[in-house]
Design a protein with these regions (language model features):
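Processing junctions and N-termini across compartments
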Residues: 31, 35-38, 268, 328-331
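Conserved alpha-helical substructure of the radical SAM core
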Residues: 2-126, 215-225, 344-347, 354
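Residues that line or immediately flank small-molecule/substrate-binding pockets and catalytic motifs
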Residues: 48, 79, 131, 203, ...
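Flexible mid-to-C-terminal extensions adjoining Fe-S/redox cofactors in radical SAM and related proteins
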Residues: 1-25, 47, 269-271, 275, ...
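Radical SAM enzyme [4Fe-4S]-AdoMet core and its adjacent flexible, acidic
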Residues: 1-7, 55, 121-290, 294-305, ...
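Amphipathic alpha-helical recognition patches that constitute DNA-binding helices
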Residues: 28, 32, 171, 186, ...
């Protein structure tokens, strides 16, 4: 998410904001700039649905300038597939000029030499590229398009080639599901071969249905035979820091029980707050604003940047209402989230208990 030591968090100011449910700073903001996608991933609905047109680049620029004034340190661009919008290098350049670090998630299939160079020269600081198996046929079965493995792996190599033009980190995202988990043992070797800096193993969402969801016996097999090999190899290659990163469904019996139910916070929020409503926001392709991806379309939007300034929404009654429900979180979606736990722990250690 963001490096706590580099955010310039004012301890007392944040504590008072938390205690009074006031706005702090949107330190980290996700921009979902496009809904559609050029792949047909079996665990995703973006390619199955047609939505309204996205917010214009000019409006996104105005919001980025506003975010800079409010103290945003990092913007993460995603979709759908963000590279279906030709203005992405322009948006990255604009945000970088306003002192904001920019990262992006992409499937990589639309990245060629020119686009890779443009993105790095525009100031892109991090890119997560989706690879769902080191085995070509499995990756393309999941992604639904033949030839996608070659173009995606090439994108990783291209970013590695041009990274000297900026300060770019390259990571591989892998959704672990019933379909692919038995093929992932050599994922660290592929990542290293392509020049990636790290891997992120992401547990499949339970909304993907029984065909993809991991049964208890699947998790047991993964944890006993595959995850240990991934952990050992990935740590040796410098792709992960701790063994925990190789166990997206948890390691202990209790964690596995909760993970099987999709509760990837593993009970943390039963007794601790989530600080995302004070430090984070998500702006959807259509301008709707949510606290995070877990609340996106699971609850009404907090506002829309098409007809209101982001500042009005950030400091408004709807955001305040969410902040009042965070001690501990009363939202069911929070129990299913593992995105913020590490940072929430660090913030809790900094300003709590209270």
């Amino acid at each position: 998410m963001y490096n706590l030591e580099q955010t310039g968090i004012e301890k007392d100011e944040l504590l008072q904001a938390v205690l009074n449910a006031r706005a702090y700073k949107p330190l980290y903001v996700k921009l979902k700039v496009f809904y559609g996608c050029n792949l047909k991933c079996e665990m995703c609905n973006h390619w199955r649905e047609t939505r309204e047109p996205p917010v214009s680049p000019e409006r996104f620029k105005a919001v980025i300038a506003e975010l800079a004034e409010l103290g945003t340190k990092k913007i993460h661009i995603s979709g759908g597939e963000p590279m279906l919008r030709p203005q992405i290098p322009e948006l990255i350049d604009f945000a970088t000029a306003h002192g904001i670090k920019v990262t992006m998630t992409t499937n990589g299939t639309l990245i060629d030499k020119t686009r890779a160079r443009q993105l790095v020269e525009a100031g892109l600081r991090g890119v997560n590229i989706s690879i769902d198996s080191p085995i070509r046929r499995m990756h393309e079965k999941i992604r639904g398009v033949k030839g996608s493995f070659k173009s995606t792996t090439k994108a990783v190599s291209l970013f590695e080639r041009y990274r000297h033009k900026g300060k770019l980190s390259v990571r591989i995202n892998t959704v672990v599901s019933r379909t692919n988990y038995q093929t992932l043992e050599t994922l660290p070797d592929l990542a290293h071969e392509l020049g990636a800096d790290g891997i992120n193993l992401i547990p499949v969402d339970d909304h993907c249905g029984e065909i993809l969801s991991m049964r208890r016996r699947d998790i047991k097999l993964f944890n006993e035979e595959i995850a240990p090999k991934i952990a050992e190899r990935a740590k040796t290659l410098g792709l992960i820091v701790s063994d925990d990163e190789a166990y997206p469904f948890g390691q202990t019996e209790e964690q596995v029980r909760l993970g099987r139910a999709g509760r990837y916070a593993f009970g943390y929020y039963d007794s601790h707050p989530c600080y995302a409503p004070w430090t984070h926001s998500l702006i959807d392709f259509n301008g709707n604003v949510y606290v995070c991806c877990m609340t996106r379309e699971r609850m009404p939007p907090l506002g829309n940047i098409v007809d209101r300034s982001f500042k009005e929404i950030w400091e408004g009654a709807n955001y305040r209402g969410i902040r009042l429900k965070m001690h501990p979180p009363a939202l069911a979606a929070c129990r299913r989230c593992d995105d913020f736990i590490d940072r929430n722990r660090k913030i809790w250690e900094t300003i709590g208990p209270y």
